[in-house]
UniProtKB/Swiss-Prot annotation:
Lineage of the organism: Eukaryota, Metazoa, Chordata, Craniata, Vertebrata
GO molecular function: ATP binding; MAP kinase kinase kinase activity; protein kinase activity; protein serine kinase activity
Active-site annotation: D205 (proton acceptor)
Entry's localization field: Cytoplasm
CDD domains registered for this protein in UniProt: STKc_Mos (cd13979)
Domain (Protein kinase) ranges: 64-345
The protein's name in its UniProt record: Serine/threonine-protein kinase mos
GO cellular component: cytoplasm
Highest taxon of source: Eukaryota
Job of this protein: Serine/threonine kinase involved in the regulation of MAPK signaling.
UniProt keywords, alphabetically: ATP-binding, Cytoplasm, Kinase, Nucleotide-binding, Serine/threonine-protein kinase, Transferase
Positions that bind ATP: L70, G71, S72, G73, G74, F75, G76, A77, V78, K91
Protein family according to the UniProt entry: Belongs to the protein kinase superfamily. Ser/Thr protein kinase family.
Catalyses which reaction(s): L-seryl-[protein] + ATP = O-phospho-L-seryl-[protein] + ADP + H(+); L-threonyl-[protein] + ATP = O-phospho-L-threonyl-[protein] + ADP + H(+)
Amino acid sequence: MPSPIPFNSFLPLELSPSADLRPCSSPVVIPGKDGKAFLGGTPSPRTRRLPPRLAWCSIDWDRLCLLQPLGSGGFGAVYKATYHGVTVAVKQVKKSSKNRLASRQSFWAELNVARLQHDNVVRVVAASTCAPASQNSLGTIIMEYVGNVTLHHVIYGTRDAWRQGEEEEGGCGRKALSMAEAVCYSCDIVTGLAFLHSQGIVHLDLKPANILITEHGACKIGDFGCSQRLEEGLSQSHHVCQQGGTYTHRAPELLKGERVTAKADIYSFAITLWQIVMREQPYLGERQYVLYAVVAYNLRPPLAAAIFHESAVGQRLRSIISCCWKADVEERLSAAQLLPSLRALKENL
């Protein structure tokens, strides 16, 4: 069996408790006609403040109004809302009764992309460690609103908006993706990764469910709850990878407890690209079997399907996937190295 994924009890030094430069009171949730409005309340004496470097993104609670829930899970809940009159998405990270440290790390990891702006990355607008007193919340993060359709929905046809017209085409509940769409999505994802890696950020949970699709069909990478920031000037983190992420997309070196590098995201991209082309789940076996086989026997999803051989584009994508999920980290291409070939492929479609 592969080595268990190490769990480290640490938080980055710059995220240690510090006085915020702006007032941030614990809000009160008041039901409204069209939603719920956050209003300032009495600050909790135990509330942690954002560190000075993040004080710019403190939340103006009286300008935030929740409209409707978009989804929920073990991390907490996401709402559609308005902030200063602009439509946004609000994530409320809940405290985990089983693992509070993991909840805290996830919240602070989300802020790794604070102040970064890129067309293929979901932008953080504001954040606060304050939360409604009635909720078991660790903090609140306001992000740009991209929509509620992910690449997972597009691939597997699990969102009604992407299933219209399929019955007329004789489909089986999902609309086929063209090679052109596969290349365009891949180009967007790698462009976003190249930007993140240039900023010293490794996502560590790249998969279709964490890639949002805009109304114009562009991809934006989101959900940075597992991300890590590499030390300036270094190509790898001095920390081994923490628990978290999705085992089907997790690079073998991380499963073995080795150091984090940006190449871990490239491995995850390869699995994601395979899903875009094949529209199947990468592995169907038991979790522990898959973990063992990926590390010990270089198990990967199959590339024998006709779609990878019938056209020049399919053959090129097969070559890219093969290169990106190599077991040896050094043999994988970087996002910056991948971009030229993907862009050339896109231009020649």
